Amino acid sequence: MEPLIRVKNMYKIYNPGENEVRALDDVSLEINQGEFVAIVGHSGSGKSTFMNMLGCLDTPDSGEYFLDGKDVANLSDNELSDIRNHKIGFIFQGFNLIPNLDALGNVELPLIYRGLGKQQRKEIAGEALSKVGLENRMDHKPNQLSGGQQQRVAVARAIAAQPPIILADEPTGNLDSKSTIEIMNILKDLHKSGRTVIIITHDDEIANQVDRVVRIMDGKIVSDSVNQ
């Protein structure tokens, strides 16, 4: 069976020459549909650069990336945009919510890009917010929500269009311990529902809660193990 994600000999080099930085240095990795994976590394390890590649937010200098059987290098900008809008739900450490929109409006945003009508958008966004326990906060703007609630809005936004892949970059990095548990439980439920969930993190406590841990250091994958 073809892996959902297949990366082979990927390089990303900044400042080529004497002072070059190999953010990704000959990285190869396969991830199958339905896996729950953490990509773990300290600051500067290359993990965020790798996330940008997996999310089709940036392009490597060399190497191959096949997503769902398609060579990403051969896709047009419109096709890449379509992947980001239909196949991948992004969750970021900084929430990235629009301050002047309420929770419902923030979750509706990716649905606008999909061309859905207003009523359909509201129904889907409302359902997504209910799934993350914010059915009573739909009309609240980000500054009226706690950090944990803001991240739950971000999760709802990521899952509203029902993408098969969830790509979460340090999703608990700005949260207290209670909110961290809540977000991880939501991500676990998303995995149980059949989605492929990939978490980028520096935190071993987060990594211990997933099925597979890929460690990256100095742009290289140094270990790939299954949690028992």
Write out the residue ranges for each language-model feature.
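ABC family nucleotide-binding domain
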Residues: E2-I216
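H-loop (His-switch) and adjacent beta-strand-loop-beta switch element
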Residues: V213-V226
